[in-house]
From Swiss-Prot:
Catalysed reaction equations from the record: 2-deoxy-D-ribose 5-phosphate = D-glyceraldehyde 3-phosphate + acetaldehyde
Protein family (similarity comment): Belongs to the DeoC/FbaB aldolase family. DeoC type 1 subfamily.
Taxonomic lineage of the native organism: Bacteria, Bacillati, Actinomycetota, Actinomycetes, Propionibacteriales
Protein name: Deoxyribose-phosphate aldolase 2
Reported function: Catalyzes a reversible aldol reaction between acetaldehyde and D-glyceraldehyde 3-phosphate to generate 2-deoxy-D-ribose 5-phosphate.
């Protein structure tokens, strides 16, 4: 990877501009979309109950979360939620892995859970799998990424940003990127609030960033 600093435009093109707070309103989401268009972010990421947006999205893509934030929903419920979101205009779905199955080492069931959602998110729609890396060992991170790849997912993602153990770390992103080897994208999310941290995640192998502090992050980029 080049050591040249990322410009605001380059970084914005990697950002899912995110609003997932429970109290978010439709007016808040309308502002989110307006800001995403202004900054040139790749997408906005919102809760599925906000769909359909019925907004002029311009070039901004639409992502939604699924099984969020616990991942403890049944596979059928996750798949139904994803299917409804796609029908309502979502182009990308960020699902949460079942951490209980991960901790029990039930990798076939982990894979099946992801595969059930992927069936509801057919290509060229994008499925990202949130593995909640802060609560996993490095071996569990590797196995979770392998399960996501086997199930046909398009990205692995560090975190919901809602777990008390924390969000993305450079170390976890490196493990994830090494595991998927460019075959899947890697999304870092949770706790990325400034330009330096965002660039560190990209340097570690992240190809997408989930952030809510987009304006602050881009303000730290060198002048173009």
């Amino acid at each position: 990877m080049s050591s040249a600093p990322l410009s605001a435009t380059e970084l914005a093109g990697m950002i899912d501009h995110t609003l997932l707070t429970p109290e978010a309103t439709h007016n808040d989401v309308a502002k989110l979309v307006a800001d995403a268009k202004k900054y040139g972010t790749w997408s906005v990421c919102v809760s599925p109950s906000m769909l359909p947006l019925n907004l002029d999205m311009g070039d901004v893509h639409l992502a939604v979360v699924c099984g969020f934030p616990s991942g403890k929903h049944t596979s059928a419920v996750k798949a139904a939620e994803a299917r409804e979101a796609i029908a309502a205009g979502a182009e990308e779905v960020d699902m949460v892995i079942n951490l209980g199955l991960v901790k029990e080492g039930r990798w076939e069931d982990v894979t099946a859970d992801i595969a059930a959602v992927k069936q509801a998110v057919p290509d060229p729609k994008i499925l990202k799998v949130i593995i909640e890396s802060a609560v996993l060992t490095d071996d569990e991170i590797v196995r979770a990424c392998q399960a996501a790849e086997k199930a046909g997912a398009d990205f692995v993602k560090t975190s919901t940003g809602f777990h008390p153990r924390g969000g993305a770390s450079v170390e976890a992103v490196k493990v994830m990127a090494d595991t998927v080897g460019g075959r899947l994208g890697v999304k870092a999310s949770g706790g990325i609030r400034d330009y330096q941290t965002a660039c560190a995640m990209v340097e570690a192998g992240a190809t997408r960033l989930g952030v809510s502090s987009t304006a602050k992050i881009l303000a730290g980029a060198p002048t173009e």
